[in-house]
Swiss-Prot record:
Oligomer and partners: The RNAP catalytic core consists of 2 alpha, 1 beta, 1 beta' and 1 omega subunit. When a sigma factor is associated with the core the holoenzyme is formed, which can initiate transcription.
GO CC terms: DNA-directed RNA polymerase complex
Positions contributing to Zn(2+) 2 binding: C891, C968, C975, C978
Name of the protein this chain belongs to: DNA-directed RNA polymerase subunit beta'
Gene: rpoC
EC number(s) recorded for this UniProt protein: 2.7.7.6
Taxonomic lineage from the root: Bacteria, Bacillati, Actinomycetota, Actinomycetes, Mycobacteriales
Binding annotation for Zn(2+) 1: C60, C62, C75, C78
Length: 1316
């Protein structure tokens, strides 16, 4: 068997009949499958043992040879080779066809490859192949030319004979008529009778003339057809063809069916044809040139690949191994079989019948009919349903052909090659495990025992609890007491992977150290729920076991949950306290005026109270019940660092050192909170709202190693749960308070609504205006009720606590519960002008309940659609970007993009750019950042983290040039410096990181949060697409809905205002030709933008516009942007537009992820003029390949090719990839394979998908080449240590062995030398 790791590329081509016979182990001659009595395969049938190998190991068909010693012998009685039965999975057979057939992929695909090659229309081709017309395959022009005059003379003689015969017959008939008339006259017959006779005579003479004329026309037809006869000419009229053969058979050959196609291909001169087509392209115009281009693609493919076009017509059909199309017996004596067997049986039956008919010398028409049926049966085998009605099995179900086995979600590619099921896995319901550390999970005992069974069995044998593996297995199955101790030992330090479907981003699979727990549920750490998007309402998770040492090392170092705190999309922590924990910390750090033990200043004879010498003393007071944790106190602190401003004031330049005392005015709760933070973190004297907690953890992630952050969030979690329990926050009916002012507020608005209603009835308002007015009124009412509610609720109300702390929910939900529901929408997405006035606490009326259901149901339907759409978007994004891998450290390019850090306000202060987090943050600086005095603030090549950005802003720098993947010069993949910091680790990205996949996941994962609907803005204007449809529109590079024109040139605008349309003319500044935009619908509205004088207003007559400026409301067409402003601008445009959609939903994704995808969309160039290169005009070429080829041609002194960049949608870009395996497994499988086979395409196996399909390690992460070939070289100390002989007393282990926490060791602590 071929080892998959030893080949570098995979080529696909056309198989000729010779190849098929070479693969085959014998010909299948009979349609029989299995003998129904003996259940053994029939000889020469579809399951024949002689061809495909024995059905049982080392046993021939007749039973003469049994068992392994006879290996390799071929039995002389039954002819079966004695070998393993698994060869029935590998050995192929073939069927020798009695007549050739065409391969349906090449004839019926769009475009028809056979048609392009032979220059025949697909309709004509179909007529020939399915025996409806004859085609001329060759003409002996020389012989015809030489003997033309002789033949013409013969033809003239024949015509003369016909004419003479006609004239003779007419003469005789005329004489007979004369005689008849004379006779009648003599008898004195009436004129009537005479007229009848005359008419009859004339009619007969007319018939004679017509008959002769028909004969002459036929001769003329035969002659003209013969003189113009040329190869590839179609003759549909059978009689005409027969005549031609009878008369001039020796001058030409013709036939019908696939044989004629085979002949035509045999006589086809590829080189000459390619030359003549190139000629046409050089000198031709219009349709002719286009057709020649398309044909040249196919012809050149055969010319360059060395494929023989004969492979498109088959003389033999391969039969796949029988184990791949099995036949199994069901209970009840019936058989279940693969559809392929039925399809093969039809082919064999028809083929055998055709052979018999040919042997019998049957009439041509019967033989042709049988050949047509054979062609149809082979078509059905290869691609059932591609032409005509599909062949159906029982119950009118179309049979699954070979193509169907590859196509679609259930096909071979997506079902078995890209999505395999995994051994050593289990799944169960998850429950919360608040006692766990961040890197741990609770694994049910029974599940762990089953997962680790082989390890436990081996260990039982090692420890002599069992004699052999078999008894060990028995012990495990009977769950003997010793087994549990061994299991504890085996699972220690062996990480497991937990996965929750749907795995939307890479944090959907993380590694944990298992702890054995009772019960059958997996326990999950509460902080990783965010990353998994898990909750405990019945979610299930799967467990997988990494087996090899390398897999365990990767799981521990790269996938352990405590090393994956940051989100790969935004680089901000995901493992944050949420829900109960937030409530707990919020409660703990709240300050309640007048609470027990509050600080009282000294007054008169009372000394001050509520002052404590240390946190320990305060805690003691709290335990005795004289101090509340939420009361304001003064406390002397020595182990907590003061806030920055106090530190500067108290300790000056030297700064605070642990042990320095300072006095804090705070609450005991806040002191306890700060003790959870790492030593040396400035004291935070605030109420811990969710946002504040997030900011602190963010800051920790920037400044401290991951291990510290992990320990801190774990402590915060414990404290959060502890205090949430003690806070007693619960929700009961009594907590939902209805504001007493609600009725009077609603009465007031009811009056206003009545007024509007009256105006409408008087006709002062139309229907739309009335609705708008009512909607406005009730929106105000709802807000006012909300306001009243807010004032009415006390601060310690649990519902308000939950909302205010940011734990969950928002004020709208509180208002719905206790205030009023407000306006709801109808199924069209418009507001219903009657509001829901009740709150859920009071209960809804029947009508209110009914109108409320619209929105609720639409929400559910929307969510389901969104999930599917978003999943499909992610799949396309992954597909287009899967080969973007970091391949080198630095591509040394000078180029980059400019990002804004801040804007100067009119008074000179800097206003920080709101999107700095997703644009400049975590990038590499492209040039030195210099302030006005010329001092370098941050050097080129520095990573921009929060401290660096703050430094730049402090120096007054408003924009910087950063490296970006859009300008990266690496030919395949990207370089680490252009990509910048990896968002998930906070360090420069590693070589081998699959940044394409990460980008696709980061964009796709929040996809489900985006809205589905297109929202209406202002009612009158065009719908502006938003949400998920807009993201799809951008990535697919479609022309947007409500497309807005952009200025082609810089110049002055002349605006002509028509009745229904605008006409905009731009007069260019450089005096060029005027640009006119005609018939622009007024519904679209003119664009508002900043003018030269700084004012913001609508575009009007005489305004000055820059090139690329949008003139109307709506969205610019990216293809237009590319045409007018070039590739750089369109890249920036796409990134900006995609970000707008995500920001509207409050989703933070870094620009670099979108840039990776956009880079893939602009990878190709379309060739305009091929110069001296091999490229075909109009073809799409990878930019790197285009530039390399041009350099080569110029170096040889030739003309370079001219091309222009082209923007491709992600689906198109995925299908245009160089890897045919990846494209075929994505969409349109048959089309991709057809094309790849004709071009003899080679797959270089650069991307991830192709390697997964063939089962190689993926070329990313530790699978990249440079990491595969590492040899470990021991240091001198290691060598010395290896040769010292330990004495008996020597500690074999380090003294602290066994005291380890099991937490991951931070990689930062190890010094790595350069790994090359």
């Amino acid at each position: 068997m071929l080892d998959v790791n030893f080949f570098d590329e995979l080529r696909i081509g056309l198989a000729t009949a010779e190849d098929i016979r070479q693969w085959s182990y014998g010909e299948v001659k009979k349609p029989e499958t299995i003998n129904y009595r003996t259940l053994k395969p029939e000889k020469d049938g579809l399951f024949c043992e002689k061809i495909f190998g024995p059905t049982r190991d080392w046993e021939c068909y007749c039973g003469k040879y049994k068992r392994a010693p006879f290996k390799g012998i071929i039995c002389e009685r039954c002819g079966v080779e004695v070998t393993r039965a698994k060869v029935r999975r590998e050995r192929m057979g073939h069927i020798e066809l009695a007549a050739p057939v065409t391969h349906i992929w090449y004839f019926k695909g769009v475009p028809s490859r056979l048609g392009y090659l032979l220059d025949l229309a697909p309709k004509d081709l179909e007529k020939i192949i399915y025996f409806a017309a004859y085609v001329i395959t060759s003409v002996d022009e020389e012989m015809r030319h030489n003997e033309l005059s002789t033949l013409e003379a013969e033809m003239a003689v024949e015509r003369k004979a016909v004419e003479d015969q006609r004239d003779g017959e007419l003469e005789a008939r005329a004489q007979k008529l004369e005689a008849d008339l004379a006779e009648l006259e003599a008898e004195g017959a009436k004129a009537d009778a005479r007229r009848k006779v005359r008419d009859g005579g004339e009619r007969e003479m007319r018939q004679i003339r017509d008959r002769a004329q028909r004969e002459l026309d036929r001769l003329e037809d035969i002659w003209s057809t013969f003189t113009k006869l040329a190869p590839k000419q179609l003759i549909v009229d059978e009689n005409l063809y027969r005549e031609l053969v009878d008369r001039y058979g020796e001058y030409f050959t013709g036939a019908m069916g696939a044989e004629s196609i085979q002949k035509l291909i045999e006589n086809f001169d590829i080189d000459a044809e390619a030359e003549s087509l190139r000629d046409v392209i050089r000198n031709g115009k219009g349709q002719k040139k286009l057709r020649a281009l398309k044909r040249l693609k196919v012809v050149a493919a055969f010319q360059q690949s060395g494929n023989s076009p004969m492979g498109m017509v088959l003389d033999a059909v391969p039969v796949i191994p029988p184990e791949l199309r099995p036949m199994v017996q069901l209970d009840g004596g019936r058989f279940a079989t693969s559809d392929l067997n039925d399809l093969y049986r039809r082919v064999i039956n028809r083929n055998n019948r055709l052979k018999r008919l040919i042997d019998l010398g049957a009439p041509e028409i019967i033989v042709n009919n049988e050949k047509r049926m054979l062609q149809e049966s082979v078509d059905a085998l290869f691609d059932n349903g591609r032409r005509g009605r599909p062949v159906t099995g029982p119950g009118n179900r179309p049979l699954k052909s070979l193509s169907d086995l590859l196509k679609g979600k259930q096909g071979r590619f997506r079902q078995n090659l890209l999505g395999k099921r995994v051994d050593y896995s289990g799944r169960s319901v998850i429950v919360v495990g608040p006692q766990l550390k961040l890197h741990q999970c609770g694994l049910p005992k029974l599940m762990a025992l089953e997962l680790f069974k082989p390890f436990v069995m081996k260990r039982l044998v090692d420890l002599n609890h069992a004699q052999n593996i078999k008894s060990a297995k028995r012990m495990v199955e009977r769950q003997r007491p010793q087994v549990w101790d061994v299991l504890e030992e085996v699972i220690a330090e062996h990480p497991v992977l937990l996965n929750r479907a749907p795995t939307l981003h890479r944090l959907g699979i993380q590694a944990f150290e298992p702890m054995l727990v009772e019960g059958k549920a997996i326990q999950l750490h509460p902080l990783v729920c965010e990353a998994f998007n898990a909750d405990f309402d019945g979610d299930q998770m799967a467990v997988h076991l990494p087996l090899s040492a390398e897999a365990q090392a990767e799981a521990r170092i790269l996938m352990l949950s405590s090393n994956n705190i940051l989100s790969p999309a935004s680089g901000r922590p995901l493992a944050m306290p949420r829900l109960d924990m937030v409530t707990g910390l919020y409660y703990l750090t709240t300050e309640v005026p007048g609470d027990t033990g509050e600080y009282q200043p000294a007054s008169g004879d009372h000394p001050e109270t509520g002052v404590y010498s240390s946190p320990a003393e305060a805690i003691m007071a709290a335990d005795r019940g004289v101090l509340s944790v939420r009361a304001k106190i003064k406390v002397r602190l020595t182990q907590l660092r003061p806030p920055v401003e106090i530190e500067a004031e108290l300790f000056g330049h030297s700064g605070w050192q642990p042990g320095d005392a300072w006095m804090a005015e705070t609450t005991l709760g806040r002191v306890m909170f700060n003790e959870l933070l790492p030593l040396g973190y400035p004291f935070v004297n605030k109420q811990m709202h969710k946002k504040v907690q997030a900011a602190i953890i963010n800051d920790l992630a920037e400044r401290y190693p991951m291990i510290v952050v992990a320990q801190t969030v774990d402590k915060l979690k414990d404290a959060g749960f502890y205090w949430a329990t003690r806070s007693g926050v619960t929700v009961s009916m009594a907590d939902v308070l209805v504001p007493p002012r609600k009725k009077e507020i609603l009465d007031h608005y009811e009056e206003r609504a009545d007024k509007v209603e009256k105006q409408f009835q008087r006709g002062a308002l139309n229907h739309d205006e009335r609705n708008e007015a009512l909607v406005e009124i009730w929106k105000e009412a709802t807000d006012e009720v909300g306001q009243a509610l807010r004032e009415h609720y006390p601060d310690d109300n649990p519902i308000i606590t939950i909302v205010d702390s940011g734990a969950t929910g928002n004020f709208t939900q509180t208002r719905t519960l206790a205030g009023m529901k407000g306006l709801v929408t109808n199924p069209k997405g418009e507001f219903i002008p009657r509001p829901v006035k009740s709150s859920f606490r009071e209960g809804l009326t029947v009508l209110e309940y009914f109108i409320n259901t619209h929105g609720a149901r639409k929400g559910l339907a929307d969510t389901a659609l969104r999930t599917a759409d978003s999943g499909y978007l992610t799949r396309r994004l992954v597909d287009v970007s899967q080969d973007v891998i970091v391949r080198e450290h630095d591509c040394q390019t000078e180029r980059g993009i400019v990002v804004e850090l801040a804007e100067r306000a009119p008074d000179g202060t800097l206003i920080r750019d709101p999107y700095i987090e997703t644009s400049a943050y975590a990038r590499t600086l492209g040039t030195d950042a210099v302030d006005e005095a010329g001092n370098v603030i941050v050097e080129r090549g520095q990573d921009l983290g929060d401290p660096e950005i703050d430094a730049l802003l402090a120096a007054g720098i408003t924009q910087v040039k950063v490296r970006s993947v859009l300008t990266c010069a690496t030919s395949t993949g990207v370089c680490a410096t252009c990509y910048g910091r990896s968002m998930a680790t906070g360090k420069l990205v590693d070589i081998g990181e699959a940044v394409g996949i990460v980008a696709a996941q980061s964009i796709g994962e929040p996809g489900t949060q985006l809205t589905m609907r297109t929202f209406h803005q202002g009612g009158v204007g065009e719908d502006i697409t938003g949400g998920l449809p807009r993201v799809q529109e951008l990535f697919e590079a479609r022309v947007p809905r409500g497309k807005a024109p952009i200025a082609d040139v810089t110049g002055r605008v002349r605006l002509e205002d028509g009745e229904r349309f605008y006409k905009i003319t731009i007069v260019p500044d450089d005096g060029g030709e005027e640009v006119v935009y005609d018939k622009i619908s007024k519904r679209q509205r003119l664009r508002v933008f900043k003018h030269e004088d700084g004012s913001e207003r609508v575009l009007s007559d005489g305004d000055h516009v820059e090139v690329g400026q949008q003139l109307m409301e709506g969205s610019a067409d990216p293809h237009e942007v590319l045409r007018v402003q070039g590739p750089r601008e369109v890249q920036i445009h796409l990134v900006r537009e995609v970000q707008e959609v995500y920001r509207a939903q409050g989703v933070s994704i870094h620009d670099k992820h979108i840039e990776v995808i956009v880079r893939q969309m602009l990878r190709r160039v379309t060739i305009i003029d091929s110069g001296s290169t091999e490229f075909l005009p109009g073809s799409l070429i990878d930019r790197a390949e285009f530039e390399a080829e041009n350099r080569r041609v110029v170096a040889e002194g030739g003309e370079p090719a001219a091309g222009r960049p082209v923007l491709m949608g992600i689906t198109k870009a995925s299908l245009a990839t160089d890897s045919w395996l990846s494209a075929a497994s994505f969409q349109e499988t048959t089309r991709v394979l057809t094309d790849a086979a004709i071009n003899c395409r080679s797959d270089k196996l650069n991307g991830l998908k192709e390697n997964v399909i063939i089962g190689k390690l993926i070329p990313a992460g530790t699978g990249i080449n440079r990491y595969r070939n590492i040899a470990v070289q021991p240091t001198e100390e290691a060598r010395a240590a290896a040769y010292t002989i330990p004495s008996y007393e020597d500690q074999y282990y380090s003294p602290d062995f066994g005291a380890a926490t099991g937490a991951a060791v931070p990689l930062d602590d190890y010094g790595y030398s350069d790994y090359r």
